[in-house]
């Protein structure tokens, strides 16, 4: 893990220097924009440099359908403000998203054409769909799309994608900057960059900003628009550190689901009708213990952790149950390989928290949390079926292009030989 080093310049100056260096070195540049406070400040800073240089940059906003109306209004305002200097990519296409508030629909698809009558809102005019991107396959995951977008937009040139994450937000985001695994995967040794595919780099210009820095920037630049939903969050008493925007049903994002019916009741009613489990999720997500699987959990009287795990599995829909059983088998097999002939009922909590020991209690906690990909067991989310479809289509296109190129060269050689023969005659 990298060591934090302090410098004698402020974070605003440092961010501007990173942006200048990026513009100096990359031929193609795009901004991944969400409408949140961090990406808004980052976009203002990037556009400041783009306008100064007279360069156009692409702005990618992936619309998840389930968004605050205030966020959509802010996106409109930002796109209009910088319309002369951006290439807009407001993307509304079916994407598979996590739904952590129910076992009956553990994933939902935004902009699902089969559920058009239940859409939370209509697509905005001029938005882009899967038809605008040759790599797009309906049902792709968000994380897969953004990587492929960078590769497609770069067209083989050196490309930078500005990402507005901050290390303060989570350990995962801190590791995106500080981990030693980035060795050889940065641009020019800059730890605020990450190589994601060939000749495409993520750039994190505000990674060292604190939440207070974000709002200090807006206080000093009142002419720069910000998302008005944060003003409503302040009025609702939400702490600055807990003010997050994203699709509302994810494993972490669901904690803010209750805010919708307070801040935007008109949007809330549509969310409840659109996504399974939205209402119950908002009611219980602030609870602890067995209701959500957070903090200390207990087993029913007369049950072991193993029998409680099996009881929880039996209450689930077959498809969801089969998914967890397959994941648990992988978990148990992995620990068998490390010398555990049997899985203990429980282990010291500090070892369980660090994933250093297996236990049936850990499996129960995964089920109670609706941890669909079993990240609490040290497992990761696999590539989606849509991504596999894209890979097959890409390989088929490349093979066809290679075949056509071979045929073209073959015809050129034949014509050349014919021309030479006629010249001799």
Residue ranges and their predicted role:
Residues 1-32, 37-425:
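Nucleotide-activated chemistry modules centered on ATP-dependent adenylation/adenylyltransferase
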């Amino acid at each position: 893990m990298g060591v934090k080093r302090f410098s004698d310049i402020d974070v605003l100056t440092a961010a501007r220097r990173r942006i200048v260096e990026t513009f100096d070195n990359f031929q193609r540049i795009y901004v991944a924009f969400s409408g949140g406070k961090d990406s808004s400040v980052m976009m203002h800073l990037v556009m400041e440099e783009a306008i100064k240089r007279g360069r156009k940059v692409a702005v990618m906003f992936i619309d998840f359908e389930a968004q605050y109306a205030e966020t959509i209004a802010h996106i409109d305002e930002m796109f209009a403000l910088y319309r002369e200097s951006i290439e807009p990519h407001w993307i509304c296409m079916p994407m598979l998203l996590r739904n952590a508030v129910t076992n009956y629909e553990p994933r939902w698809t935004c902009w699902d054409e089969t559920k058009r009558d239940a859409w939370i809102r209509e697509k905005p005019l001029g938005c882009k769909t899967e038809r605008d991107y040759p790599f797009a396959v309906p049902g792709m995951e968000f994380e897969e799309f953004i990587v492929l977008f960078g590769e497609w937009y770069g067209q083989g040139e050196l490309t930078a994608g500005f990402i507005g994450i901050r290390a303060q937000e989570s350990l995962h985001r801190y590791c995106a900057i500080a981990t030693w695994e980035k060795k050889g995967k940065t641009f020019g040794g800059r730890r605020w960059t990450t190589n994601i595919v060939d000749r495409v780099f993520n750039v994190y210009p505000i990674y060292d900003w604190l939440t207070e820095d974000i709002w200090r920037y807006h206080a000093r630049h009142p002419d720069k628009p910000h998302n008005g939903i944060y003003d409503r969050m302040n009025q609702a008493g939400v702490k600055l550190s807990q003010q997050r925007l994203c699709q509302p049903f994810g494993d972490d994002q669901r904690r803010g689901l209750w805010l919708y019916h307070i801040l935007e009741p008109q949007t809330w009613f549509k969310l409840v009708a659109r996504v399974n489990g939205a209402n119950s999720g908002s009611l219980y997500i602030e609870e602890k213990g067995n209701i959500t699987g957070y903090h200390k959990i207990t087993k029913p009287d007369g049950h072991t952790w193993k029998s409680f795990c099996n009881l929880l599995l039996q209450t689930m829909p077959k498809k969801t149950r089969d998914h967890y059983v397959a994941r648990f088998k992988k978990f148990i097999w992995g620990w068998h390989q490390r010398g555990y002939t049997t899985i203990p009922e429980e282990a010291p909590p500090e070892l369980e928290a660090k994933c250093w020991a297996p236990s049936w209690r850990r499996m129960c906690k995964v089920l109670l949390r609706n941890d669909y990909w079993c990240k609490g067991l040290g497992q990761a989310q696999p590539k989606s079926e849509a991504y596999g479809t894209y890979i097959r289509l890409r390989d088929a296109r490349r093979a066809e292009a290679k075949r056509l190129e071979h045929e073209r060269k073959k015809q050129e050689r034949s014509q050349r030989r014919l021309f030479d023969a006629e010249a001799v005659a």
